[in-house]
C-alpha cells in the first residue's frame, strides 16, 4: 500500500498543472492509524466534489464491542459517529481556497432520523470504521493548487478523524446513550406486536415541529399526555418504566377542532417507523 508521503510527492509533482492531473492521486494511502482512499476525482473545480473514504482500524478506534453487537446499536453508533464527523468537517470546509467548489469538505447531512447509511459503517467483526465524504480539490481557475489540498489532507482531515472517530476523544456517555436509546426504541416496537398495538406515543413527547420546513421539535410546546382510556405502561431495558398512549389494531377516530393537533399527531405516528435521535420528542 502507498503511504501518505507517496501522495504528498504526487501532489507536489502536479502542482500548478492542469486540473486533470489530479486524477493521478486516485488510490489508497496509509496515514498513520487510518487509511485514506481517493475513490473518484472530479473533472474540474466546478463539478461535483471528489469522493473519498477513511478507514480507521478497530484496534485504533477502540470502540467497545458491546456498543455495536446488535443491528440497532451498530446503526445508532454509526449515526452518532457520522454526525460527530460532520460537525468537525464543518469547521474546516472552505478553509482551503480556490475557484468553484475548491475547499469544500462535506458528508451526508443527517436529519432527525437514525438510519443505516453508507456514509458511515462499522464492521461488526473487526470494529473497523469506514466514513465516506466529499472534498473539493482546490484550483485557481483550472490550475491545480496542490498546497491547498495538502492543508486539507494533512492538517484538517487528521484533526477531524482524531476528534470524531477515536473513542478516547468522544463524549463516551453520549455514545453509550445513543446505543441504549436504540435498544429501547427497538424494544417498544417489539412490544407493540405482543400487546396488539399498532402505535405508541410516550407521555412527555413533543410532537409539534418548529416549522413546516423543519423536523426539529418546537420550543416551549405542550408535552403530550395520554388519555387514561388508552394509557399503556412498558418497562424498557434502559430507561425503565415508560407510560403513554397505545393505539390498538382496528379503527381509531381522531377528532378535534382547528389547530387542536390532529395532523400533528398523525404526522408523528407516520414518522414513528424510524428511530430518532435523543431530544427529537417523537
Model-flagged regions — what are they?
Residues 196-199, 204-212:
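Extended, polar beta-sheet/loop recognition surfaces of beta-rich domains
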Residues 63-64, 141-144, 208-211, 255-257, ...:
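Short helix/loop capping segments that flank catalytic or ligand/cofactor-binding pockets
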Residues 242-270:
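Glycine-rich phosphate-binding P-loop
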Residues 1-196, 207:
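N-terminal accessory targeting/assembly segments
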Residues 208-243, 282:
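N-terminal pre-Walker A segment at the start of P-loop NTPase domains
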Residues 202-204, 234-240, 251, 273:
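Short, flexible loop/turn elements at secondary-structure junctions
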Amino acid at each position: 500500500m502507498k503511504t501518505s508521503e507517496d501522495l504528498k510527492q504526487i501532489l507536489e509533482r502536479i502542482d500548478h498543472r492542469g486540473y486533470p492531473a489530479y486524477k493521478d492521486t486516485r488510490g489508497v494511502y496509509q496515514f498513520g492509524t487510518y487509511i485514506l482512499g481517493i475513490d473518484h476525482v472530479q473533472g474540474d473545480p466546478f463539478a461535483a466534489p471528489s469522493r473519498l473514504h477513511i478507514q480507521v482500524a478497530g484496534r485504533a478506534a477502540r470502540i467497545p464491542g458491546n456498543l455495536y453487537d446488535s443491528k440497532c446499536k451498530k446503526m445508532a453508533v454509526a449515526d452518532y459517529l457520522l454526525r460527530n464527523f460532520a460537525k468537525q468537517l464543518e469547521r474546516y470546509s472552505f478553509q482551503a481556497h480556490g475557484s468553484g467548489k475548491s475547499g469544500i469538505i462535506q458528508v451526508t447531512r443527517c436529519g432527525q432520523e437514525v438510519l443505516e447509511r453508507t456514509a458511515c459503517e462499522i464492521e461488526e467483526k473487526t470494529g473497523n470504521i469506514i466514513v465516506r465524504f466529499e472534498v473539493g480539490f482546490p484550483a485557481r481557475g483550472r490550475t491545480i493548487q496542490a498546497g491547498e489540498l495538502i492543508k486539507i489532507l494533512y492538517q484538517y482531515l487528521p484533526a477531524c478523524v482524531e476528534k470524531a472517530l477515536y473513542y478516547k476523544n468522544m463524549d463516551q456517555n453520549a455514545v453509550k446513550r445513543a446505543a441504549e436509546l436504540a435498544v429501547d426504541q427497538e424494544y417498544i416496537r417489539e412490544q407493540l406486536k405482543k400487546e396488539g398495538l399498532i402505535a405508541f406515543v410516550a407521555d412527555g413527547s413533543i410532537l409539534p415541529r418548529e416549522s413546516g420546513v423543519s423536523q426539529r421539535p418546537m420550543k416551549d410546546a405542550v408535552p403530550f399526555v395520554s388519555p387514561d382510556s388508552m394509557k399503556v405502561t412498558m418497562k424498557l431495558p434502559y430507561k425503565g418504566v415508560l407510560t403513554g398512549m397505545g393505539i390498538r389494531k382496528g379503527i381509531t377516530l381522531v377528532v378535534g377542532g382547528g389547530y387542536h393537533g390532529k395532523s400533528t399527531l398523525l404526522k408523528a405516528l407516520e414518522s414513528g417507523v424510524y428511530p430518532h435521535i435523543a431530544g427529537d420528542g417523537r
